[in-house]
Amino acid sequence: MAMDNVTAVFQFLLIGISNYPQWRDTFFTLVLIIYLSTLLGNGFMIFLIHFDPNLHTPIYFFLSNLSFLDLCYGTASMPQALVHCFSTHPYLSYPRCLAQTSVSLALATAECLLLAAMAYDRVVAISNPLRYSVVMNGPVCVCLVATSWGTSLVLTAMLILSLRLHFCGANVINHFACEILSLIKLTCSDTSLNEFMILITSIFTLLLPFGFVLLSYIRIAMAIIRIRSLQGRLKAFTTCGSHLTVVTIFYGSAISMYMKTQSKSYPDQDKFISVFYGALTPMLNPLIYSLRKKDVKRAIRKVMLKRT
């Protein structure tokens, strides 16, 4: 933040689930289960991919990065949401709130771009299998991942550094965590530039990658149709369908949050929508993308045999 940002507010009150006290225990239990599943599932995938040389392939390189992103993304907000469930003073200082906003934004943006890179990898693998190892070589994979991370950091820095927020007393955030939209809603400054930048950034990090992913899966579906075996087609469609479902939940919920005017924003609705891309998909990704694969099951058996 610029040094000339003068505010009358130094901490924020995060409402979280406190305006629904009857749901507090249920919410705490669900978030705890989701967070532990996120840690175990993604942490185990990172370990397994590093441990087994047979998983040192392009797709698992992408999946290990996705698992790392999901692990960090879940950790950026869920532990705080758990602590604040039963806290009598669920306050967060302005620097911590801004830091959480920056970290969550960078991780989410990187994941949006990484999912598009993974879709490209699958298209190459299915449409051009003979040249797959040539097209998706090590440097190309590293470049795609580095571009995802680099672009997310640059865009996040642009959005955060462009904030010139003056808070005139209101400090109640109706959310489970600090997000850039939550801060903008509280300010008494003119936020038209910030809203415009968020919209443009969302087009390049949400709408375009999601469109690319959908087109990629259409190409994959056309390739699957040419499979002669009915059982093979059904299995491929089931796999692609589950992948596409999770991707749609992630992109769709984020698009519904960030690509609308603030006048059409409903805080109670928005904070529960954020659970889909901030908590649910980080838990589901290792289950959908990795743990059902034969290579992963084989690697798990290998680990279990070594332990015995």
UniProtKB/Swiss-Prot annotation:
What processes does the entry annotate via GO biological process terms?
detection of chemical stimulus involved in sensory perception of smell
Where is this chain's protein located in or outside the cell?
A: Cell membrane
Q: Classify the protein's membrane topology as the record does.
A: Multi-pass membrane protein
Parts of the chain that traverse the membrane: 26-46, 55-75, 100-120, 140-159, 197-216, 237-257, 271-291
Which Gene Ontology molecular-function terms are recorded? G protein-coupled receptor activity; olfactory receptor activity
| Extracellular topological segments | 1-25, 76-99, 160-196, 258-270
Q: Which GO terms describe its cellular component?
A: plasma membrane
List S-S links within the chain: C97-C188
Q: Does the keyword Transmembrane apply?
A: yes
Query: InterPro entries given for it?
Result: GPCR_Rhodpsn, GPCR_Rhodpsn_7TM, Olfact_rcpt
Give the domain of life. Eukaryota
Glycosylation site list: N5
Query: Which residues does the entry place in the Cytoplasmic compartment?
Result: 47-54, 121-139, 217-236, 292-308
> Gene3D superfamilies of this UniProt entry?
Rhodopsin 7-helix transmembrane proteins
- Where's it mainly located? membrane
Q: Which UniProt keywords apply?
A: Cell membrane, Disulfide bond, G-protein coupled receptor, Glycoprotein, Membrane, Olfaction, Receptor, Sensory transduction, Transducer, Transmembrane, Transmembrane helix
What does this protein do, in the record's words? Answer: Odorant receptor.
| Similarity remark | Belongs to the G-protein coupled receptor 1 family.
Q: How is this protein named in the record?
A: Olfactory receptor 13H1
Q: Which organism is it from?
A: Homo sapiens
Q: Which gene encodes it?
A: OR13H1
